């Protein structure tokens, strides 16, 4: 049993398979988490806070905002170091329950047309909702092929029955599945921690899966709507 995404990119991380290159700066809330290299994604939810996955934890992270091609300087980037990295207190590294983390930036990001925040969910999203996942993760489920430019994939939230049948006994109430049971399109290594945005709200964080884009093995995402109170209380107390 191989968990594909449940490690930052230097081990085995998560990436977009079967997607397309995002329109430049169209996902302006997307962050690249770096420690000398890109290892996970994140989402800017305020000028000073980024949401990612707890399995992406490092004590010191450089957050890169306004990025499209992470290999070159495009003039729109903001590089800001973390001052606090806060894993969810109930994160379970064995089953990846509560796979969510907050990063406080050392200074506020400047919000503009290249760097913007994404709204937290006003309510949970129902199955069938169409969403956008993005990241710089692996383009292939079978080999290593990491893109320089941000990739996007439109995908639906799957029913909890489909999710539970794909991963019996492994899906908690803090997870949901999204993608395509027939395979071929999925997030993958290097996408971990990145956004799943539905109707302008951050509903998911890229968490784990079995391989990438495999038949009957959709991607599994942290259910952000369950964490609104933890996010707001953590931000206000830090």
From Swiss-Prot:
Name the reaction it catalyses: Preferential cleavage: Arg-|-Xaa, Lys-|-Xaa
N-terminal signal peptide? 1-7
Enzyme class name:
hydrolase
Cofactor descriptive note: Binds 1 Ca(2+) ion per subunit.
Q: Name one Pfam family in it.
A: Trypsin
Q: Which UniProt keywords apply?
A: Calcium, Digestion, Disulfide bond, Hydrolase, Metal-binding, Protease, Secreted, Serine protease, Signal, Zymogen
Source superkingdom: Eukaryota
Propeptide section residues: 8-15
Disulfide topology: 22-152, 40-56, 124-225, 131-198, 163-177, 188-212
What subcellular compartments does it reside in? Secreted, Extracellular space
Provide the binding site for Ca(2+).
67, 69, 72, 77
Domain annotation Peptidase S1: ranges: 16-236
- EC numbers listed for it are 3.4.21.4
Offer a single GO CC term for the protein: extracellular space
- Does the keyword section mention Metal-binding? yes
Matching entries from PANTHER family are given as: RIKEN CDNA 2210010C04 GENE, TRYPSIN-RELATED
Name assigned to this protein: Trypsin-3
Q: Which organism is it from?
A: Salmo salar
> Source organism lineage?
Eukaryota, Metazoa, Chordata, Craniata, Vertebrata
């Amino acid at each position: 049993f191989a968990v594909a995404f449940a490690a930052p990119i230097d081990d085995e991380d998560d990436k977009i398979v079967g997607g397309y290159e995002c329109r430049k700066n169209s996902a302006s809330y997307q962050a690249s988490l770096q420690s000398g290299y890109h290892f996970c994604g994140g989402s800017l939810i305020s000028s000073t806070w980024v949401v990612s996955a707890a399995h992406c934890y490092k004590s010191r992270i450089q957050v890169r905002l306004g990025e499209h091609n992470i290999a070159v300087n495009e003039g729109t980037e903001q590089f800001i170091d973390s001052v606090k990295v806060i894993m969810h207190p109930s994160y379970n590294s064995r089953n990846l329950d509560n796979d969510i983390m907050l990063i406080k930036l050392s200074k506020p990001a400047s919000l503009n047309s290249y760097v913007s925040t994404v709204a937290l969910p006003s309510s949970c999203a129902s199955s069938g909702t169409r969403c956008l996942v993005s990241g710089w993760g692996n383009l292939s489920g079978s080999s290593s092929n990491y893109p320089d430019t941000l990739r996007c994939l439109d995908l639906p939230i799957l029913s909890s029955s489909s999710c539970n049948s794909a991963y019996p006994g492994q899906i908690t109430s803090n997870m949901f599945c999204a993608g395509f049971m027939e395979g071929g399109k999925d997030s993958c290594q290097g996408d971990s921690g990145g956004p799943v945005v539905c109707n302008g709200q951050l509903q998911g964080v890229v968490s784990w899966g079995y391989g990438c884009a495999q038949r009957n093995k959709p991607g599994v995402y942290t259910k952000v709507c369950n964490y609104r109170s933890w996010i707001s209380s953590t931000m206000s107390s830090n």
